[in-house]
């Protein structure tokens, strides 16, 4: 609660020194410390309800769709037949909501280490919680890395919806994790993981893409605009055992497109077009 001063929440972190994003608070809805992290939910004046983990904004009702749609539909529309999907993290439910929009998906497993995040979403993020009770969804509360050690060659698409590489999410940005991801993929499978902002963490992104290129035949980086995240954008690393993920390879039907607020085929392709400073550094 020390992040709220004089009616304003400010996101201050050593992971983006010298930067801060603030929202005016209308009402604190929930605050709790779990075994893994501190989580806070508040109603803001301009961004709706806001979920905060360890002082860092994870989702706001105003702009969450820009992240959830892109991290989900880029890999799913890049795969010819995504039947089995795994989501690591994603306890707010947003990625689940997007995955089950795909008729081809037969099953989706959510692996979340902290059940408190799921409960907070169920109680305070009504537009994000809708996927939890879908018949195609299975919830697993526990360590994602341990879960994948028991799964080999099983998933067509794996999405890592993690927080930043500090605290409980640190291991999700390391080589050993991407080795587990690769082993859990079916032939032609695709990994898509949250991969920070090129404006603030280009060296982190470079390190990740460098070792991923040693593991996967195709490694690419995309990004989306989202005002409530540091730097106003967030990126995704796409690691494919098949072809490129830079354009959708299946039809985006009018029925599916009508459910989107951000994603479409042109945005999919444009998200891989990097400004020169990032393209030069990442050399993808």
Curated annotation (Swiss-Prot):
Example GO molecular function: spermidine synthase activity
E.C. code: 2.5.1.16
Catalysed reactions, as listed in the record: S-adenosyl 3-(methylsulfanyl)propylamine + putrescine = S-methyl-5'-thioadenosine + spermidine + H(+)
Family under the similarity heading: Belongs to the spermidine/spermine synthase family.
Classification via CDD domains: AdoMet_MTases
GO BP term, example: sorocarp stalk morphogenesis
Protein name: Spermidine synthase
Pfam families: Spermine_synt_N, Spermine_synth
InterPro entries the UniProt entry points to: PABS, PABS_CS, SAM-dependent_MTases_sf, Spermi_synthase, Spermi_synthase_euk, Spermidine_synt_N, Spermidine_synt_N_sf
Top-level taxonomic group: Eukaryota
Known function: Catalyzes the production of spermidine from putrescine and decarboxylated S-adenosylmethionine (dcSAM). Has a strong preference for putrescine as substrate.
Domain PABS per the UniProt entry, residue ranges: 6-241
Keyword terms, alphabetized: Polyamine biosynthesis, Spermidine biosynthesis, Transferase
Binding locations of S-adenosyl 3-(methylsulfanyl)propylamine: 37, 68, 92, 112, 143-144, 161
Record-linked HAMAP family: Spermidine_synth
Pathway the protein contributes to: Amine and polyamine biosynthesis; spermidine biosynthesis; spermidine from putrescine: step 1/1
Binding residue positions for putrescine: 67, 161-164, 229
GO cellular component, one term: cytosol
Enzyme active site: 161 (proton acceptor)
Keyword Transferase appears in the UniProt entry: yes
């Amino acid at each position: 609660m020390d992040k709220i001063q004089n009616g304003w929440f400010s996101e201050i972190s050593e992971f983006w020194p010298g930067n801060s994003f603030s929202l005016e608070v209308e009402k604190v809805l929930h605050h709790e410390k779990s075994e893994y992290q501190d989580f806070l939910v508040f109603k803001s004046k301009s961004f709706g309800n806001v979920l905060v983990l360890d002082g860092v904004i994870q989702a706001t009702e105003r702009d969450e769709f820009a992240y959830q749609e892109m991290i989900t539909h880029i890999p799913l529309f890049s795969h010819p037949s995504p039947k089995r999907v795994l989501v690591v993290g994603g306890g707010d439910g947003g990625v689940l909501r997007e995955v089950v929009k795909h008729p081809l998906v037969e099953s989706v497993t959510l692996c979340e280490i902290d059940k408190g995040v799921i409960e907070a979403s169920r109680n305070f993020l009504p537009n994000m919680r809708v996927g939890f009770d879908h018949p195609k969804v299975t919830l697993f509360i526990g360590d994602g890395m341990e879960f994948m050690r028991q799964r080999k060659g099983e998933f067509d698409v794996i999405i890592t919806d993690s927080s930043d590489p500090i605290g409980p999410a640190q291991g999700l940005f390391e080589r050993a994790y991407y080795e587990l991801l690769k082993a859990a993929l079916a032939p032609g499978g695709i990994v898509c993981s949250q991969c920070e902002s090129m404006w603030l963490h280009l060296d982190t992104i470079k390190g990740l893409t460098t070792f991923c290129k040693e593991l996967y035949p195709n490694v690419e980086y995309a990004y989306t605009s989202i005002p409530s995240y540091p730097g106003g954008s967030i990126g995704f690393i796409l690691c494919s055992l098949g072809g490129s993920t830079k354009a959708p390879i299946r039809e985006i039907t009018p029925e599916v497109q009508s459910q989107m607020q951000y994603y479409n085929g042109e945005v999919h392709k444009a998200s891989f077009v990097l400004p020169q400073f990032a393209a030069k550094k990442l050399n993808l």
